[in-house]
């Protein structure tokens, strides 16, 4: 009997040790092999080293400061940001234009956007997909982004400079919670992807969604409303 109790106790201790949270490592790589995420207990300003890179958890304010580099000199590259706590990414790309370089812009593909609800104007008038400003190898691949919480994508790619070069297959995005797609892809005049699989049942505004996209011949989203 005592032996059985000892076995049970040892088993319990073993399970407890296995389930103990590792508070020495605040960040981890998502199962997709790309996205860098923060653990549930992480707060703004938490830092940690993962695969040789020092990361910092940021929030809406830190990610959208126009004088970002002067306020946060410890963060020298975009790839050092862990964005799990960010909920609003409206027009942030414009703030990064002052950096004068897109050498590390590709690293935004590692950003965790799973809690973001607004991407309104995210890349509005951004040079970030234009090979005249960005080396082809530094253009970010946005197909890994988990946009399932986003409700506002209005103007997300509106008149991005070099918009002719934005033609990524974003058909796998979960846009089922988006209500506003006003001018989302307006001006991306080389975009040509099949977005007919998108669940746009909640969209209430898609006006001018695809204006000035002359090359777009593949199926577009099946909106439940008119997108004049």
Where are these regions (language model features)?
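N-terminal hydrophobic targeting signals that begin at the initiator methionine
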Residues: 1-2, 18
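Sec-dependent signal peptide recognition
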Residues: 2-8
């Amino acid at each position: 009997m005592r032996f059985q109790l000892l076995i049970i106790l040892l088993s319990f201790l073993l399970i407890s040790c296995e389930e103990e949270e590792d508070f020495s490592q605040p960040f981890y790589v998502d199962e997709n092999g790309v996205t860098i995420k923060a653990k549930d207990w992480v707060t703004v300003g938490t830092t940690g080293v993962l695969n040789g890179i020092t990361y910092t958890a940021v929030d809406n304010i830190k990610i959208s400061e126009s004088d970002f580099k002067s306020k946060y000199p410890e963060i020298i590259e975009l790839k050092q940001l862990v964005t799990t706590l960010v909920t609003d990414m409206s027009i942030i790309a414009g703030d990064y234009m002052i950096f004068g370089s897109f050498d590390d812009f590709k690293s935004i593909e590692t950003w965790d956007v799973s809690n973001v609800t607004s991407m309104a104007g995210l890349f509005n008038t951004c040079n970030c997909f234009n090979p005249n400003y960005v080396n082809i190898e530094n253009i970010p691949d946005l197909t890994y982004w988990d946009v399932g919480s986003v409700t506002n994508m209005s103007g997300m790619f509106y008149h991005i400079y070099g918009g002719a070069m934005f033609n990524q297959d974003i058909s796998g995005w979960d846009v089922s919670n988006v209500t506003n797609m006003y001018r989302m892809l307006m001006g991306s005049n080389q975009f040509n992807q099949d977005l007919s699989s998108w669940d746009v049942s909640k969209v209430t505004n898609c006006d001018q969604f695809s204006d000035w996209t002359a090359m777009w011949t593949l199926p577009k989203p099946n909106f439940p409303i008119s997108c004049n």
